[in-house]
Amino acid sequence: VQSGVGRTGKFLATEHYDIQPDMVTLAKGLGGGVPIGALLMTEEVALKMPKGGHGTTFGGNPLACAAALAVLEEIEGRNLLQHVSEVGNYFQEQLRSIASPKIRTVRGKGLLI
């Protein structure tokens, strides 16, 4: 939830590392301002969940789902992940160029600086 979809230059921040999470939660950025949440899980975990074990009275809201679909289409259609990587690198370079004793290091991935 904190890193948001695409904020690091990859759809999920976990893609930068050699890990495969069993579950990942998404929210905020997925809806582009419209409240939504999602839980992604491996097939192995999903098959162990009891039927109805992941239900919600608000699940499947058509407006929220349409907003999330629009966000996903924009990310893909505008090649935003590549853009985030490029702009993030630029920002980090610029921040490093104004180094001062108060800025010890600049680190991050994409726009999660």
Question: What is each model feature region?
Answer:
Residues V1-I113:
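Conserved N-terminal phosphate-binding loop of PLP-dependent enzymes in the Aspartate aminotransferase
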